[in-house]
Each structure stands twice: as structure tokens, then as C-alpha cells.
Design a protein with these regions (language model features):
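Conserved beta-strand segments that form the floor/walls of ligand-binding pockets within enzyme
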Residues: 6, 66, 83
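Enriched for short, Lys/Arg-rich terminal
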Residues: 71-103
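A short, surface-exposed loop/turn module that caps and links secondary-structure elements
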Residues: 40-67
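Generic leucine side-chain signal with a strong bias for well-ordered alpha-helical environments
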Residues: 7, 38-39, 45, 88
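Arg/Lys-rich, positively charged N-terminal/basic patches that mediate binding to nucleic acids
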Residues: 1-35
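Short, hydrophobic secondary-structure boundary micro-motifs
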Residues: 31, 53-55, 96
Length: 103
């Protein structure tokens, strides 16, 4: 069963920040390529959502998946959708994902 993939506001903000950083460092083409790959990886969870590593130690039901050693996608699988809670750039700590939001 395919699930709908939804990016949270926080995940959308992460995508924008990653794009801006790469754009400043390497230009528009590279930023488009990297962000495109990240979003493709997110939307690929619609068919096979139980990928990555379960991280109940951070939040019950949270899963994380690395993307090409460039980023980590943090997400939760629900009955009919996959919610992307964060897309963290290389070196960012997934443990702080929910702390920073005060959750």
C-alpha cells in the first residue's frame, strides 16, 4: 500500500536551509541536484516506508535514514502517510531534532 509523504514545516525549513547553504558554497546547479536527491529519497518512502533505523530512544516510532552520506531524514510512518519531521545536513545531531522544537 502506498502512503502519502508529507513534509512537516520544520522539514521544509530544513530543506530551504540546506539549499541556501549549498547554493552559497557551490552554486545553483549543485543545490538543485542535492535537494532534488533528498526530496526523491523522501518521496521514495511512499512505497517502502520501513527503511532506515528505528530510533524509539529519541521518540516512539521515529525512523532515520541516511541519504548518500549527505543528510539524514527523520520520519514517522502512520497508517496512511509518512511524515518527514526533519532533514538534517551532514554532521547535525538527530538527537536534538525534537529538543530544538521544545517537544
Amino acid at each position: 500500500m502506498k502512503r502519502r509523504v508529507v513534509l512537516s514545516l520544520r522539514a521544509e525549513q530544513h530543506v530551504a536551509a540546506i539549499y541556501d547553504y549549498i547554493f552559497e558554497q557551490s552554486g545553483e546547479l549543485r543545490a538543485d541536484t542535492v535537494v532534488g536527491r533528498l526530496l526523491d529519497a523522501c518521496h521514495g518512502l511512499d512505497t517502502f516506508p520501513l527503511r532506515g533505523t528505528q530510533r524509539d530512544d529519541i521518540r516512539e516510532g521515529l525512523r532515520v535514514m541516511g541519504v548518500r552520506r549527505q543528510a539524514t531524514i527523520a520520519f514517522m510512518v502512520e497508517a496512511e502517510r509518512v511524515v518527514i519531521h526533519g532533514i538534517l545536513g551532514r554532521g547535525q545531531d538527530v538527537n536534538r531534532l525534537f529538543e530544538d522544537a521544545g517537544e
